[in-house]
Amino acid sequence: MCTTYAARELAEAIRSAGGHVERLLLVRLNPAVEHKTRGNAALAVHTDLDADRALSLARETLDLARTDDPKTNPGAVVADCGPGDVPDEVAGFTVDAIRSIQDRTTATLLADTAGFARLQRGNGRGVVGALAAVGAWAALDDWTYEHITYREPDRWGTDRDVDAESVRAAADEHYPAVWDTVDRASGYPVCVPRTPCPILYGVRGDDPDACQAVADAIEGEPVARRATFVTNQGTDVHLQDGSVDSVTDASAYRVTGRVVDAPETREGGHVFVTIAGEEASAGDPAASAPQPDSESRLQCVAFEPTKRFRDRVRALRPGDRVTVCGEVSDGTLKLEKFAARSLVRTEPATPVCPTCERTMSSAGRNQGYRCRDCSTSADGKTDRPIERDLDRGWYEVPPVARRHIATPLVRGGFDGATHPMR
């Protein structure tokens, strides 16, 4: 069963039991985790219902899960405190679960130490996400929204009937308050999942009312249920600052360096580019910029599904200074976005004779250049301006390839110009 659907059902059960539901929280955890649902989601229901009664209802909700699937290991944690009053260690665990790999033993011990009740099915791995969801409100401060509609149960697993044109029209009307609803280049409605889950569509954005307005304007099959979630989607909270020589697998980073070779398109249409790390110019207090570290290298890749984003990567040249963002796997950073900080604007060229306006010829090893016609000489090559099919600023993958947790450029707050991709 879809995790958001289970949370929505739990919230309804709490209301039926006389409790007030303050909010539903949808927390995306580390996207690099191997043992996860597709989006690695953890859910929290903030309520004033008695903790013992909430625990009983959570147990009933867990019993709805498909535990015959070895990949399904749900868990629940009930914290008898306000969402912002959890121990600092629990809030810290949330951040760790978003940025690195956490184990169920640590989660179990931390929940027990805090005095939180817990439930689990299968091997107990679900307690990791459950505890992370409990700590999220205290740990995070950047929140967005998703309005999710659900299908009638007898339609689960069948093709969805959603009018794509109505999706595009509603998305255009409410952009940029609502984002990642449609991929404009392909026309694909990103808000409509391709999996056999109960979700009909989910509309994301910074304004909950706009999200619901878009959902209400979409035409298609009947909507059985709906709910608005407060989420950390579109926030880049999974990214941590790193350097070329400090990144590790299964975490995501922002890394600044210089391009060391021309981007290469390999089999499958994937585009690879390598950057060198940077280090301050030792002994030179007047140095205005970090210099390339000759030892450190980080391979980056824009996979084929990122489509036109690959053209932005192909436009990079050796010497360009960039900040790259993405998850590291097998020593390679999977590009989610990058910033062109400074661009090479010239290239070495054989000098042209100022008198004859002809290209000079080499005068011999280490002897510079000489004009064949008038013998005018030059000491070495000159800098020739080059045209760049790239501007300074941030570039991103298209909506169809964007991870739930990655920030779309249209949200703003970046340290440079942005070139949003719709």
Stretch-by-stretch model annotation:
Residues 54, 58, 62, 68-253:
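Long, hydrophobic alpha/beta structural blocks
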Residues 321, 327-354:
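OB-fold/S1-family single-stranded nucleic acid-binding modules
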Residues 229-231, 353-356, 371-374:
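Short cysteine-rich clusters marking metal-coordination/redox-active sites
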Residues 252-261, 314-330, 338:
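OB-fold and OB-like beta-barrel modules that bind single-stranded nucleic acids
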Residues 365-377:
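Cysteine-rich micro-motifs
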Residues 262-306:
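OB-fold (S1/OB) nucleic-acid-binding surfaces
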Residues 249-269, 349:
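Structural detector for short beta-strands of small beta-barrel domains
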Residues 25-27, 382-422:
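Long, charge-rich boundary regions
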